[in-house]
Regions:
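Active-site loop/oxyanion-hole signature of alpha/beta-hydrolase fold enzymes
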Residues: 2-10, 41-93, 97, 101, ...
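Flexible "cap/lid" loop of the alpha/beta hydrolase fold
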Residues: 107-108, 114-153, 159, 235
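The conserved beta1-alpha1 loop
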Residues: 21-27, 95, 227
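Alpha/beta-hydrolase active-site loop signature
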Residues: 27, 54-58, 127, 257-260
Length: 278
């Protein structure tokens, strides 16, 4: 059976009584949230953080189809009992692709032995469909570019040069290079992600409508929608729709784009600490 990679983060000498699950965006990994998670558990040592590598990302490779949002969430539900030590998952934070996975995960957890979440935090991700890929054209372009990758490179530098020559800026190229690994029994390197299957996951993400989960939340779950002030992912109509829902809060971080945790980590941390009890 293929195992999902989940890394626990706890405060020093602490035994968590509850967990916050972090879900990354497309082409990312749980490690993207490690610094944020460490700061969170230092402030709230009764909580532990679980950094998930979603299927086909990071160290969670080899998963079979279907590559759907429902399957991505189910992977997590099945993996949690092996890493929680019996303490419940009480909150989920998901960014971008991970935000919508988080909504589906909340739905599935409610029907599992874990039970409903207390808090769901969705960072710059709309619950509804986006057939026009609004706000995600850059990521979509990168995925399409990666579909054209040569099978191997002499080294990581050659990989970053290849993507930079095709218009990807250096910070993104270096971030993508984290997924370049040696080819076994050779001196060459390859991009280890299954890009065609990741594109399939993105296609499902863009067509799913999960507003009904927020309109009829499981148990007493509170939902918090966070938008980057200069991001186009959440439209004004999305924010207004969120504000009309009982049990849902909406916050806009004015000094942030789509990557809220990179652009305004302190603001995001204060919001999360406030949601989870100060």
């Amino acid at each position: 059976m293929t195992a999902l990679a989940v890394a626990p983060v706890t405060a020093k000498d602490a035994t968590p009584s509850k967990w916050l699950v972090f879900l990354h965006g497309i082409l990312g990994s749980g490690a993207n949230w490690r610094t944020f998670a460490r700061q969170f558990v230092a402030a709230k040592p009764e909580w532990g953080a679980l950094l998930v590598d979603l299927r086909l990302h990071g160290d969670s490779q080899g998963f079979a189809p279907p590559h759907t949002l429902e399957a991505v969430a189910r992977d997590i539900v099945e993996a949690l009992p092996t890493v929680t030590g019996g303490a419940p998952v009480r909150a989920v934070l998901g960014h971008s692709f991970g935000g919508k996975v988080g909504i589906e995960l909340a739905r599935q957890l409610a029907a599992s032995p874990n039970g409903p979440l207390d808090q769901l935090i969705v960072v710059d991700s709309t619950p509804g469909p986006r057939p026009d890929h609004r706000g995600s054209s850059n990521v979509r372009h990168i995925v399409e570019l990666l579909m054209q990758l040569p099978p191997e490179f002499p080294d990581r530098t050659a990989f970053t040069a290849w993507v930079e020559e095709r218009g990807v800026n250096r910070p993104i190229a270096m971030w993508l290079a984290m997924n370049v690994r040696p080819v076994p029994n050779t001196t060459r390197f390859e991009f280890r992600l299954d890009v065609p299957s990741i594109r399939t996951m993105m296609d499902d993400y863009f067509v799913q409508d999960l507003w009904p989960v927020l309109e009829n939340p499981p148990g007493h779950m509170a939902t918090h929608l966070i938008a980057g002030g200069s991001s186009e992912v959440l439209e004004a109509a999305d924010l207004e729709r969120g504000r009309t829902l009982a049990g849902t809060t909406v916050d806009v971080v004015p000094n942030a784009g789509h990557w809220v945790h990179v652009d305004a980590p302190d603001t995001l941390r204060e919001l999360v600490l406030g949601y989870l009890g100060g």
